[in-house]
Amino acid sequence: MSIPTTPDVKITPLMPKRIPKNKLFVSPESSWTPDSDGKWQLHPFAFDRWDVEEMAYHDTCSLHIGLNPFNVFKVHGSDYLKMLTCATVNTFHNFPVGKARHVIFCDDGGKILLDGILVRTGEEDFLGFNLVDPNFLNMQMGNPFQIECKNLREEYFVFQLCGKRSLEIVEQVCRKDLHDLKFMYSTQAEIDGKEVLILRTGMSGTLAYEIHGNAADAPEIYQKLLDIGAEYGIQESGRLCYVNQHCVGSIFQLAEHFNIRFAPLDDEFILSGSLPRDSELQFHSPYDCGWGNLVKFDHDFPGKAALLAESQRHHNTAVHLIWNKEDILKVQAAVMDPDKRVDYMDMVGDYDFKNNCSTIHMDAVYDGDKLIGASSDRMLSAKTREMISICTIDEDYAVEGTEVEVLWGNPGTYQMRLRATVTLMPYIKENRNNNFDVESIPHPVFDK
């Protein structure tokens, strides 16, 4: 039976040339129809077995392209930093050209509304990734700031490469020695005469780089990465691997690990897991995520009073949990008991195919009858073969080796308490991107 297709339509470089007329579910949260106008990207849930994809960002190099099309704003004007200072927890002292910075927007209660990355590409030029629309933000403030802004969503691509061979691949593709590029810094380069930006950052915690450029150049550059990367063991990675990277990399991600309190999106995300639906633990402050060092109180910003009070009192912090293997097997056995309604536990990780997959799985963490934290993004590490999760927890329990219990199962099901052990962040403690010695990697030699 042939599948009816539409004529060629305006698509991103990552979509096929001809699109089946019926609705598609490729990456589960990314359903696409010809009239969805690029709202969702087409991207596989997986290219290979989950463990093959995940081991690549430890042993060789994983290549992820599922962020495209991405919310990218090109901004001109020194007032942009003044505007962000008024709107975020950050200050922008010591922010030279080429530097990237993690930027956090909070509500009046000190809970995170949005976070993303800002790259300074010139004295008055910036690229904002997953940040509030600068024109909208300026308008909300009464348009006091002089800036020029363009949304590059349809014109920009981002490729993410993670793993100890990532530097070698990027250098060979660009034909440029990038050993001097520091963590969270960017530089300009070319790939076959096409201008790109290289940023040393990544989600997996391992050595990682991003390649940014014009969307029209994306297919050719992608193929070149695969061709050159084959020698170094490059592995395409799908959505599941990318989500799990954040847990292994000890990086909280909005809508994966915590919810936001924002009226227009009240129906956008739904909770699954054992955490009570009215629990404040579903909303995270920077301190809940271990990002308290980014909060600067030398300026006014939304949420300042709440965060200042939080910083001065007993509060939560971020850890990992290692789940007890015997208790995990008890859940697997209970699933097959017809007298119990136990939620199935996917060994690879929690991924809920509901509400177009805008579901956040969060489990309650207890010490006896005391609710002490919220666990999310449970996954089986392909490298350590430990079941781990990322967790915000009462700081009294943020001690290596502390034993806690995670409640497994949605309300209304047969719930089980599973033992877990606290381990401090980061989960990957050796050869992290921020301190990886790139001089242990040979400098490139290029064929003439």
Question: Where are the predicted features?
Answer:
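Extended, compositionally biased flexible segments
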Residues: 59-125, 129-146
